[in-house]
Amino acid sequence: MLPKGLMISAPSSGTGKTTVMLGLLRAFSNMGLNVQPFKSGPDYIDPAFHEAASRRPSFNLDSWAMDEALLNAICAQAVGADLAIAEGSMGLFDGVATKGATGFGSSAETAERMDWPIILVLDISGQAQSAAATALGFAKYAPKLPFAG
């Protein structure tokens, strides 16, 4: 059985997703939890950092490039872990443009498929109340997605 999980995402690249991901991986690992890291999308640099922080290999979950059988086989790497954490790529809804609210292969699509709550990382430098409007906009854009914070 797959463990519960989280998706770390953001409105865009460069907002601190990797920093938050690495901090969570190391903190949970130091608490004695066996954490399975994943990267949503085709990134091959961040998974090496994930492995260093979690002491477990990180795997890519790319619903655009991988068929369902391969995605399921990769997800099976989390069997036996206490928790799975995936780091999104680009922005939460960014993927191959399709008709509808989210792009094909987006982190939102992966989070929904895995039933993982989303932690939205915001770079709020130079903002105050506007940061709340951004977070609210993301939550209302796709109300079926479970936002954890």
Name the predicted role of every residue range.
Residues L2-T15, T19, L25-M114, I118, ...:
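ATP-dependent carboxylate-amine ligase catalytic core
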Residues F147-G149:
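A glycine-rich helix N-cap at a beta->alpha junction
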